[in-house]
Amino acid sequence: MEKFNTHTGVAAPLNRSNVDTDQIIPAVYLKRVTRTGFEDGLFAGWRKDPEFILNQEPYKNASVLVAGPDFGTGSSREHAVWALMDYGFRVVLSSRFADIFRGNSGKAGLLAAQMEQSDIELIWKLLEQQPGAEITVNLEDRTVTLGTHTFGFDVDDYTRWRLMEGLDDIGLTLRNEEAIEAFESQRASFKPRTIPAS
């Protein structure tokens, strides 16, 4: 997983509340067994509309999504996070996230930054005035900067640490590789073992 410290990118305003995982990526797109290639399913129902925000020229390369409250509700679907990331998003800003979505995001490398709704609405207003404007998200300082405006955001310390270190679940496990090998070397030979990668 790539380390996350600071990200600057075009921000897309998604002025909708209660965006659930089925709207983020419909179930019909969940049939593949890999973790990549889901970008075509992202907001598939809405992207058919030429007026949808991600179909507008200033936002086609957006990497920061500024969403309404209750983003990522619905079924537990890692594919929702993967679709956002495959499309190019590194950050989602919202005033409220579904807990499972927020957890899946941090584990996959997507920053789900929780902000005050009044700040989200001001960012929407600023983006309406400057379509295609870039936002800088600083995870170390927990700030979002758009032009002369700086806002704070919340993310729990553990998720922040994982993102800044670039640690997914496998990366976390590999930090203990020596201890795992030491344990395996002392384990009785008749018990199951992990086989070293060749």
Curated annotation (Swiss-Prot):
| GO biological process: one example | L-leucine biosynthetic process
Assigned keywords, A-Z = Amino-acid biosynthesis, Branched-chain amino acid biosynthesis, Leucine biosynthesis, Lyase
Which reaction is recorded as catalysed by this protein? (2R,3S)-3-isopropylmalate = (2S)-2-isopropylmalate
Output the CDD domains linked to this UniProt entry: IPMI_Swivel
One example GO MF annotation: 3-isopropylmalate dehydratase activity
Q: Note the superkingdom of the native organism.
A: Bacteria
Q: Which PANTHER family match?
A: 3-ISOPROPYLMALATE DEHYDRATASE SMALL SUBUNIT, 3-ISOPROPYLMALATE DEHYDRATASE SMALL SUBUNIT 2-RELATED-RELATED
**What protein am I looking at?**
3-isopropylmalate dehydratase small subunit
Please name the source species: Corynebacterium jeikeium (strain K411)
Question: What is the gene called?
Answer: leuD
